[in-house]
């Protein structure tokens, strides 16, 4: 059920002004956010319906009033830099954009918990560029004012490509990640106001003094849960320690799940954050996109390839021959074998996995995105964050090591408000994860096959080295470890 403050009623003079603080504690100054008169005129019943229909919860630890969601682009605060021009290609803001924008424009720290494909990049990106433009207006020299940290190079490049469209002349935007020329990236950093980066390369550049983070006023931790899963917690702490304190910096965190580890990270880096949850409640560690129809088939391991061929013949023939299909495998050599198998059956297919060099990965993704190759076989390197338009079907040939990864895999379809389909092969070898998978299916109102229920519905207790024992609603396994199996 949507929650709202009793202070959400109309008020055309409403603005969000930070509480007075001592000079040493003050957040970076910026014009106060003033709600537009047009938004102020929207009946309260429409605001209530919007929050309820999108299952939105807003939690604010401060005494400040709850700000009305910006449900139309015409309600955005005035801007003299034509920042909003690219938004003309969209009909309206997504729920996560609508609710977080007012708080971000007001300078508040924000935590956004939302499914994949919900429009998070522009949710943090538009306020980011607006803030940097305000900072640059009062400083003639180049300075790094905003840093966006993300777990993978593919996601870093994707965010960069989206933000370029909103970046006017005078705002340098650099994308830094491993596997590319450091010299080229250093040159880009010299003129950068905004950096999109992976943790490892960002830490490298800070360690060798190629960049200065002392003037950062806007920090984004995108897919924070995934960065912790990948072991970047200490790198992130080292990077953030080089920035101004949380009282002098606006910090934004977006995450698809809300486990204890992410909550502790938020406590460490943020100051009185507003927490916005879309499509669920904070007691749920993970949730699946309800627009995705999930079909789970219990099969024998030796029957996977024949079933895969049958599904491709069903969904990739005739008028559907160019529909995008994303096929997930667990191991690199398995992905290579499946790619060859699919190609041998006459389908156009490409692959992406960790053994491929950067150029090969780019070429595969570009071919898939353009539609020239409609089938892509991937390991989990492609499962998180990549915004590949119009993926009609996700096929899980091998179940991942965690149900979190399952949710992020299937989240490659059903994006930007569209419907999607995900078909998963589940074997006896995966039965330790059956309880977690059942919870995911239940939470999204999906059919649960009897064969899956026979494996059990118990979600086991989980141990974490740092946080002890706790229960996870949708995970039955300990943290995934690297296994040499089919590699």
From Swiss-Prot:
Residues 291-456 form the Helicase C-terminal domain. The keyword Calcium does not apply. Transmembrane segments: none annotated. Its main location: nucleus. Keywords: ATP-binding, Helicase, Hydrolase, Nucleotide-binding, Nucleus, Ribosome biogenesis, RNA-binding, rRNA processing. Pfam families: DEAD, Helicase_C. It is found in: Nucleus, Nucleolus. GO terms for molecular function: ATP binding; ATP hydrolysis activity; RNA binding; RNA helicase activity. One of its GO terms (biological process) is rRNA processing. It is an enzyme of class 3 (hydrolase). A motif (Q motif) lies at residues 71-98. Residues 1-40 are annotated as: Disordered. Its EC number is 3.6.4.13. InterPro entries: DEAD/DEAH_box_helicase_dom (IPR011545), Helicase_ATP-bd (IPR014001), Helicase_C-like (IPR001650), P-loop_NTPase (IPR027417), RNA-helicase_DEAD-box_CS (IPR000629). A motif (DEAD box) lies at residues 222-225. It catalyses: ATP + H2O = ADP + phosphate + H(+). Residues 101-276 form the Helicase ATP-binding domain. The keyword rRNA processing applies. ATP-dependent RNA helicase required for 60S ribosomal subunit synthesis. Involved in efficient pre-rRNA processing, predominantly at site A3, which is necessary for the normal formation of 25S and 5.8S rRNAs. PANTHER family: ATP-DEPENDENT RNA HELICASE DBP3 (PTHR47958). Belongs to the DEAD box helicase family. DDX5/DBP2 subfamily. This is ATP-dependent RNA helicase DBP3.
């Amino acid at each position: 059920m949507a929650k709202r403050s009793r202070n959400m009623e109309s008020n055309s003079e409403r603005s969000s002004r930070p509480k007075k603080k001592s000079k040493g504690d003050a957040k970076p100054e910026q014009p106060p956010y003033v709600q537009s008169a047009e938004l102020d005129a929207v009946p309260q019943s429409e605001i209530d319906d919007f929050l309820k229909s999108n299952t939105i919860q807003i939690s604010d630890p401060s005494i400040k009033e709850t700000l009305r969601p910006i449900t139309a682009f015409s309600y955005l605060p005035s801007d003299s830099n034509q920042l909003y021009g690219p938004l003309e290609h969209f009909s309206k803001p997504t729920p996560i954009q609508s609710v977080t924008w007012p708080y971000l424009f007001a300078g508040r720290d924000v935590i956004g918990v939302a499914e994949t494909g919900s429009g998070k990049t522009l949710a943090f990106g538009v306020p980011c560029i607006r803030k940097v433009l305000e900072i640059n207006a009062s400083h003639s020299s180049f300075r790094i004012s905003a840093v966006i940290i993300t777990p993978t190079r593919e996601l870093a490049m994707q965010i960069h490509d989206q933000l370029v469209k909103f970046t006017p002349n005078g705002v340098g935007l650099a994308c830094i990640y491993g596997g590319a020329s450091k010299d080229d990236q250093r040159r880009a950093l010299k003129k950068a106001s905004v950096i999109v980066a992976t943790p490892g390369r960002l830490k490298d550049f800070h360690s060798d003094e190629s960049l200065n983070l002392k003037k950062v006023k806007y920090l984004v931790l995108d897919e924070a849960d995934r960065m912790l899963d990948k072991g970047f917690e200490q790198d992130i702490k080292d990077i953030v320690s080089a920035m101004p304190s949380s009282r002098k910096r606006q910090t934004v965190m977006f995450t698809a799940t809300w486990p204890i580890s992410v909550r502790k990270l938020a406590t460490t880096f943020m100051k009185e954050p507003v927490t916005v949850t879309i499509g669920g409640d904070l007691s749920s560690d993970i949730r699946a996109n309800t627009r995705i129809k999930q079909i789970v088939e219990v099969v024998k391991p030796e029957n996977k390839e024949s079933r895969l061929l049958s599904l491709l013949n069903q969904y990739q023939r005739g008028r559907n021959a160019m529909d995008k299909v994303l096929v997930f495998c667990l191991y690199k050599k398995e992905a290579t074998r499946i790619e060859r198998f699919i190609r041998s059956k006459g389908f156009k297919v490409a692959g992406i996995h960790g053994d491929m060099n950067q150029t090969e990965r780019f070429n595969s993704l570009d071919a898939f995105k353009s539609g020239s190759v409609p089938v892509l076989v991937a390991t989990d390197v492609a499962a998180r964050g990549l915004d590949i338009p119009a993926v009609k079907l996700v096929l899980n040939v091998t179940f991942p090591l965690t149900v979190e990864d399952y949710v992020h895999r299937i989240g490659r379809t059903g994006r930007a408000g569209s419907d999607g389909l995900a078909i998963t092969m589940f074997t006896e070898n995966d039965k330790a994860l059956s309880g977690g998978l059942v919870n995911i299916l239940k939470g999204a109102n999906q059919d649960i096959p009897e064969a899956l229920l026979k494996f059990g519905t118990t979600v086991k207790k989980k141990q974490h080295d740092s946080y002890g024992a706790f229960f996870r609603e949708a995970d039955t396994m300990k943290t995934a470890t690297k296994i040499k199996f089919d590699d």
